């Protein structure tokens, strides 16, 4: 079971992934992987941080400014992604009932280790819920079920996706 969620920025992909993770944990399932949250300063987005779903470890994925690796205005910290995000996915492959990856996008795919572990997840039988940057839909749409989140359907999709996951985990 592989479920991918896409949608416009700010529509609630991360919120949906986190709500599903919390509900699954509440029901006793072991959830692994990570989510990515915005870092804001004075109401402006200045970066992104990764938070692991098993240990709540946090690290900065990207921040506005100069760096060796850039995506748009953000410097991407590949070492942080590799040491925290990739390791969380590896643990989840071994120990979790489901893997959640938020998100599959340009920043994350700057890391070779991230690309490799995502390939490993896709090839495995481990259930996956991943959010997809809209530019990456074509790469993943044939690898699982794709949902497009909108403001109008996000409550309905929460129930629908949660029920589909629960049916697959039984």
Swiss-Prot record:
Reactions listed under catalytic activity: a ribonucleoside 5'-triphosphate + H2O = a ribonucleoside 5'-diphosphate + phosphate + H(+)
InterPro entries the record matches: AAA+_ATPase, Nuc-triphosphatase_THEP1, P-loop_NTPase
Keyword tags: ATP-binding, Hydrolase, Nucleotide-binding
Binding-site list for ATP: 7-14, 98-105
Source domain of life: Archaea
GO molecular function, one term: ATP hydrolysis activity
SUPFAM superfamilies for this protein: P-loop containing nucleoside triphosphate hydrolases
EC nos: 3.6.1.15
Enzyme class per UniProt: hydrolase
Keyword Transcription: no
Stated family: Belongs to the THEP1 NTPase family.
Function: Has nucleotide phosphatase activity towards ATP, GTP, CTP, TTP and UTP. May hydrolyze nucleoside diphosphates with lower efficiency.
Alphabetized PANTHER family for the sequence: CANCER-RELATED NUCLEOSIDE-TRIPHOSPHATASE
UniProt name for this protein: Nucleoside-triphosphatase THEP1
């Amino acid at each position: 079971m592989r479920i991918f969620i896409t949608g416009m920025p700010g529509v609630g992909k991360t919120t949906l992934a986190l709500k599903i993770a919390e509900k699954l944990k509440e029901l006793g399932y072991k959830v692994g992987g990570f989510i990515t949250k915005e870092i804001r300063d004075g109401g402006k987005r200045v970066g992104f941080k990764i938070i692991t779903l098993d240990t709540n470890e946090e690290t900065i994925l990207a921040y506005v400014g100069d760096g060796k690796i850039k995506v748009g205005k953000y410097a991407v910290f590949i070492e942080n992604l590799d040491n925290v995000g990739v390791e969380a996915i590896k643990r989840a492959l071994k120990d979790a009932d489901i893997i959640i990856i938020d998100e599959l996008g340009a920043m994350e795919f700057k890391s070779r280790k991230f690309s490799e572990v995502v390939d490993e997840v896709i090839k495995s039988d481990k259930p996956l819920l991943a959010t997809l940057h809209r530019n990456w839909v074509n790469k993943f749409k044939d690898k699982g079920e794709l949902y497009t989140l909108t403001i109008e359907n996000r409550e309905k999709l929460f129930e629908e996706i949660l029920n589909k996951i629960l049916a697959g985990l039984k």
